[in-house]
């Protein structure tokens, strides 16, 4: 009688006895016996998972120097890998192979994993996986897409059941199709029948039910495979006509696959046809969509309209600017009322116009309301929409050109600012101030006084030159600290000294003024130092005995030079405090740390 073959657990124990904890072989004969017994033993996937024999054999293969033993171990591991792979191939296809070639070309949608290719464990796992998939994808919109696809194929009529294939041809098909998927999902294409298909066909209805189950099982991949790119024009439309054309092409492909011949080489042409079909589908969607979804942009041409609509709150884009009422509606909500706009001075109109960043001249809605002819405003609006970089510059400085003369006539459109001699005020874009254009013209009587307020201090002395001299009015203290003034004065003094001029210039007066100012400032500020005290005459402990009064004085009273010191501002510091002084009176701080004595 022959002894019963050892169990996988016994084989594992024998292998562990023949190697050390670092997987180095201690007993070569025992390891070779273990590998030969494993080569003959019909091991199952569950036994491999329980005993972890795959990891042990792989570690031995890496550590051994016997090439024959390493080759046998590698061959054994590959046979075990084929045993494990078909079970996990569906999960790997759904997780990691979604971006593989063929999965995004529309051909992945009619693939079904091959049931029964790996024996009973795989079929049980497959049924459990199919039952779990609808729950996983229940909250996604992909089921809606599979229903639509099922409905389209039901309307078109699904191709009938394919003819049965002999067992030998099916056996030759399974090893070719299962390890090498042709379109991104493991398993064979649907047109090649599996044992379940060839065993009993229920007609077109049963085939349709199987196809719906296939859609549920494939989960996300069919919808992702036929979903167009986000930049495609027909993104928001239901994919009805595209799927109809896809179903027609797939029906033709199924007919092609039914012809006899070697089954495996048809995989790559099928994938290329699927990719061609997806490209045809995108162009078909473009031809079939004269109107587009609300959120998508069919072509670059309407894009400027949408951008302009965000800037100009009017129902018409900027390409049709010859309607002044639309422009008038734009400025009225921001303005208080048209009458008060007319009462304000021109300078404020220009300031408000420059504040509008939309590039529309603010004086356009005012001129027709004031009784002037609206034709000039129309012409100006047409000129404003001329486009290009020149139009941007014109828009930026456009409010200068819209000024009303004292006579009540409108200035012509397109006139350069240099030719407008009648203006009282002008806006300086560099200083962002409103300044008078010429000093000779008299001030208008109807203009309010507060238009003079935005001027700087340097402009006010020019207006009051008749009352005070600029020398008395100017704040020389502020000017002396200006770096530009100081650099200018130093350059002037160097020029004067090099030319040998004897006349004192502005730099002489400025330097004299600065010297005088500095002397008065130093005289006003006193230095902050410690109070000096004379040499001590009484030395307790040296010249006489230490008394109780000395102890009380050093503990409870301030004794300069003994338990602390005093500064000129009346602050007392003991020897544990930091002292901060200003010995020169020039804001320079001298910080004395504790336990430091200065002579």
UniProtKB/Swiss-Prot annotation:
Biased segments, Polar residues type: 174-191
GO biological process entries: positive regulation of gene expression; regulation of transcription by RNA polymerase II
Modified residues (Phosphoserine): 447, 469
GO molecular function: transcription coregulator activity
Keywords assigned by UniProt, alphabetized: Activator, Nucleus, Phosphoprotein, Transcription, Transcription regulation
SUPFAM superfamilies found in the cross-reference section: Conserved domain common to transcription factors TFIIS, elongin A, CRSP70
Ranges for domain TFIIS N-terminal: 10-87
Segments of skewed composition (Pro residues): 314-324
PANTHER family to which the protein is assigned, alphabetical: CRSP70, MEDIATOR OF RNA POLYMERASE II TRANSCRIPTION SUBUNIT 26
Function text: Component of the Mediator complex, a coactivator involved in the regulated transcription of nearly all RNA polymerase II-dependent genes. Mediator functions as a bridge to convey information from gene-specific regulatory proteins to the basal RNA polymerase II transcription machinery. Mediator is recruited to promoters by direct interactions with regulatory proteins and serves as a scaffold for the assembly of a functional pre-initiation complex with RNA polymerase II and the general transcription factors.
Assembly notes: Component of the Mediator complex, which is composed of MED1, MED4, MED6, MED7, MED8, MED9, MED10, MED11, MED12, MED13, MED13L, MED14, MED15, MED16, MED17, MED18, MED19, MED20, MED21, MED22, MED23, MED24, MED25, MED26, MED27, MED29, MED30, MED31, CCNC, CDK8 and CDC2L6/CDK11. The MED12, MED13, CCNC and CDK8 subunits form a distinct module termed the CDK8 module. Mediator containing the CDK8 module is less active than Mediator lacking this module in supporting transcriptional activation.
Protein family membership: Belongs to the Mediator complex subunit 26 family.
Protein name: Mediator of RNA polymerase II transcription subunit 26
Species assigned in the record: Bos taurus
Gene name in the database record: MED26
């Amino acid at each position: 009688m022959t002894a019963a073959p050892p169990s996988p657990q016994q084989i594992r124990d024998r292998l562990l006895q023949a190697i050390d904890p670092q997987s180095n072989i201690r007993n070569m004969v025992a390891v070779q016996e273990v590998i030969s017994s494993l080569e003959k033993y019909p091991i199952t996937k569950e036994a491999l998972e329980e005993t972890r024999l795959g990891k042990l054999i792989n570690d031995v293969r890496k550590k051994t120097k016997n090439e024959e033993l390493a080759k046998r171990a590698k061959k054994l591991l590959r046979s075990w890998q084929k045993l494990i792979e078909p079970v996990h191939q569906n999960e790997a296809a759904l997780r990691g192979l979604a971006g593989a070639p063929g999965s995004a070309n529309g051909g992945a949608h009619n693939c079904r994993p091959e049931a029964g290719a790996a024996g009973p464990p795989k079929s049980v796992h497959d049924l459990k996986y199919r039952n779990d998939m609808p729950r996983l994808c229940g909250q996604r919109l992909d089921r809606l897409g599979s229903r639509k696809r099922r409905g389209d194929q039901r309307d078109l009529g699904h191709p009938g059941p394919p003819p049965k294939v002999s067992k030998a041809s099916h056996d030759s098909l399974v090893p070719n199709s299962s390890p090498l998927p042709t379109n991104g999902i493991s398993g064979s294409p649907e047109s090649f029948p599996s044992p379940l298909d060839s065993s009993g066909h229920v007609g077109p209805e049963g085939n349709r039910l199987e196809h719906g189950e296939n859609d549920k099982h494939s989960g996300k991949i069919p919808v992702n495979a036929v979903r167009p790119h986000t930049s495609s024009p027909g993104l928001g439309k239901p994919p009805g006509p595209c799927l109809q054309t896809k179903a027609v092409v797939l029906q033709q492909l199924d007919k092609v696959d039914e012809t006899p011949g070697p089954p495996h080489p048809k995989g790559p042409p099928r994938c290329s046809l699927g990719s061609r079909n997806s490209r045809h589908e995108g162009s078909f969607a473009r031809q079939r969509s004269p109107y587009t979804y609300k959120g998508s942009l069919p072509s670059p041409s309407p894009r400027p309209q949408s951008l302009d609509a965000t800037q100009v709150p009017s129902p018409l884009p900027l390409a049709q600017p010859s309607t002044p009422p639309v422009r008038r509606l734009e400025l009225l909500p921001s303005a208080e009322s048209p009458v008060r706009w007319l009462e304000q001075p021109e300078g404020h109109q220009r300031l408000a116009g420059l504040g509008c960043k939309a590039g529309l001249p603010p004086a356009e809605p005012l001129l027709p309301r004031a009784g002037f002819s609206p034709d000039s405003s129309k012409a100006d609006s047409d000129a404003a929409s001329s486009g290009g970089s020149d139009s941007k510059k014109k828009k930026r400085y456009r409010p200068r050109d819209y000024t009303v003369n004292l006579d009540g006539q409108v200035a012509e459109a397109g006139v350069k600012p240099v030719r407008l001699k009648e203006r009282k005020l002008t806006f300086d874009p560099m200083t962002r101030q409103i300044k008078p254009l010429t000093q000779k013209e008299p001030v208008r009587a109807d203009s309010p006084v507060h238009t003079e307020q935005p001027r700087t201090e340097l402009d006010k002395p020019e207006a009051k030159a008749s009352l005070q001299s600029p020398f008395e009015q100017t704040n020389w203290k502020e000017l002396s600290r200006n770096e530009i003034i100081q650099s200018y004065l130093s350059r002037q003094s160097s020029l004067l000294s090099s030319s040998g001029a004897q006349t004192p210039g502005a730099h002489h007066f400025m330097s004299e003024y600065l010297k005088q100012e500095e002397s008065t400032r130093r005289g006003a500020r006193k230095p902050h130092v410690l109070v000096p005290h004379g040499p001590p005459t009484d030395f307790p402990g040296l010249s006489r005995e230490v008394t109780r009064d000395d102890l009380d004085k050093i503990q409870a009273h301030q004794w300069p030079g003994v338990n602390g010191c005093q500064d000129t501002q009346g602050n007392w510091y003991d020897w544990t405090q930091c002292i901060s002084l200003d010995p020169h009176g020039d804001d320079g701080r001298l910080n004395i740390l504790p336990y430091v004595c200065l002579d």
